[in-house]
Regions:
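Glycine/proline-rich loop-helix segments at beta-alpha junctions forming the active-site rim
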Residues: 1-12, 17-20, 90-140
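Active-site and ligand/interface coordination hotspots across diverse enzymes
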Residues: 1-57, 61, 119-124
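A structural signal for short, well-ordered beta-strand segments and their strand-loop junctions
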Residues: 26-27, 65, 85-88, 125-129
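Short, surface-exposed acidic-centric catalytic microdomains
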Residues: 36-103
């Protein structure tokens, strides 16, 4: 659902938080790229986003699929194998001029990161994949 006024559009997060039962790590981003930039319907799927390229290098892994449902399933399987969960800090936000950079996103509703941690008690580390302040990422 979205609502637009002037240069701002209200957007709700399009994806569910993904946290495998065995998750030891939780990657927390800000909000997905604008839907016009999706290569697949999952986190960090923007055409210009380098998250999955970095993951490939860090883990010496190569993803076979880079678009569509197979890319989503491949990444979920990979995250499960590495005990990594993934979410974003904004549940609903204003987006300025359809831009995807953090400085063009303004929170309306923040994700309750503490609830995720309460539900998944094995998570030992939070990895912030954003330039936004830590207090915003944790909903403080």
């Amino acid at each position: 659902m979205s609502w637009k006024k002037d240069n701002y559009e209200v957007e709700e997060h399009p994806f569910e938080t993904f946290v495998p039962l065995n998750a030891l790590f939780l990657v927390v981003g800000t909000f997905p790229t604008h839907k016009n930039n999706f290569r697949f319907k999952f986190f960090y799927s923007g055409k210009d986003n380098s998250f999955w390229n970095i993951i490939e290098k860090v883990f010496n892994h190569s993803f076979k699929y880079n678009d569509g449902d197979k890319a989503v399933e491949e990444r979920k399987t990979f995250l499960k194998s590495k005990a990594i969960g993934i979410t974003d800090m904004h549940e609903k936000c204003y987006r300025k001029n359809n831009y995807s950079t953090d400085e063009n996103l303004f929170p309306i509703i923040l994700k309750d990161i503490f609830s995720i941690l309460d539900e998944h008690t094995f998570i030992k580390r939070i990895i912030l994949a954003s330039r936004t302040e830590v207090s915003v990422a944790l909903g403080l």
